[in-house]
């Protein structure tokens, strides 16, 4: 869907003049960093981590016995043992290193690019954790036995990344990033030089004038970009209309488990949207269900719709087992939802969709186990 950029940026401009905190970003991020497994406050990450702690992190991802194929070929015990041995557990040190991603890359469960699947030609690669955008800060915790992979901590997950996709930097240069003024990508797939940046990406800027930002690329090169080119000063103040326009622009994009092909699954759709506003949500739907205030949990149909009727659109989430849905507000006598979905009920979608809960016969109230919101209640907001 085409975004009217002029109207979109006018909306962002006036949102950024607002002082009403609909989302308490600082408190929310602090809770995520301190309570949600896999999330981390990278700005205050220590220069050293005990070896025993690193070992536990590396061993946490045991081999899933349901995985029967590697690159569509039957897997065997020798292959599994080689994958596990490449984690290099005997060479763990306490020293952490620091870096930034050079380009869009993939974070893996094991130090290999091989696809690990339950069945042949399975679209879901269990080795794929997540896409990571360019210029993301990462903590380098460990190196694989073959020397080709780094085990990293990002703000939203841990896993293995190809070492050639990471710039090593000094601790001081790493820390400087967090105190540097940044822009944020507010529409999808913005090209800068040879790199593609997805929505929510944050990029340091060196200077700006009336028409251009001078941005610092991961390789320290400088690029001048027009201010209307999908960019805004970070963070954008939360506004439901901005969220709506962004989600509408992604409708019909392919569903993509773990972002392996550069698109989104259900949880990355939610995470990327709120990164624009400065919220560092966790990466998977189960962890996202632990963030915010619970406004409904395993009730009946009537209480489900009462809760939605009172909920704030676009910062309220409906949770199913293994799935998260964004609530988009009321539409006459119905209720709108947005989600990236492979299959819903008996229908295969494989894309980002907008639906009506009632008229599209979703029966969502019988499938959901929780509704949460990350918006402040109106009495807790201030002008």
Sequence positions of predicted segments:
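Active-site nucleophilic cysteine motif
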Residues: 257-286
